[in-house]
Regions:
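Metallocofactor- and cofactor-centric catalytic cores in central/energy metabolism, strongly enriched
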Residues: 1-152
Length: 152
């Protein structure tokens, strides 16, 4: 149970990182590496090492802080780049929205396996990086079903 909770925390941190990349021109190759590696680590049977997952969460936070360093000292925090609490997804009362967001998330995790292995082999596609970011943001946003479907 602890590992699953850490994986949820990592996923929430990745959604926060994705939020920080939207409209930001400072995202680097390292930013995308952290995002893809983090998503890959949340796949079933990839990592049961709690210490490694905690380190991945810290790496995601460092990457986010590099993109939006002013968020740490903001006098009027807006929460825009905060980590997402995945319990909001699991406890979503609308089962259709919960199911659609879960489908998006699990699909992203599966895609991350391919993207991770491509990354290890030296291949990268900026459009794929952006897609990961935009799709993670959708999981963390509160939309009615009709609007969520339009945004996919």
């Amino acid at each position: 149970a602890q590992t699953a909770q850490l994986q949820d925390e990592l996923t929430g941190a990745l959604i926060g990182l994705a939020r920080a990349t939207v409209g930001d021109t400072l995202a680097t190759e390292e930013t995308w590496n952290v995002m893809i590696t983090g998503l890959f680590a949340t796949l079933t049977n990839v990592s049961f090492d709690d210490a490694a997952i905690r380190e991945q969460i810290a790496a995601v936070h460092r990457a986010k802080d590099a993109l939006v360093p002013q968020c740490q000292s903001c006098g009027a925090p807006c929460g825009r780049n905060d980590d997402y609490d995945l319990r909001q997804l699991w406890e979503e009362p609308d089962e259709d929205i919960r199911s659609l967001k879960s489908l998006i998330l699990f699909g992203l995790r599966g895609m991350a396996a391919y993207a991770y292995h491509a990354m290890v082999l030296g291949y990268r596609d900026a459009a794929i990086d952006t897609f990961f970011s935009e799709a993670l943001c959708k999981v963390g946003e509160a939309f009615p079903m009709e609007e969520l479907l339009q945004r996919l």
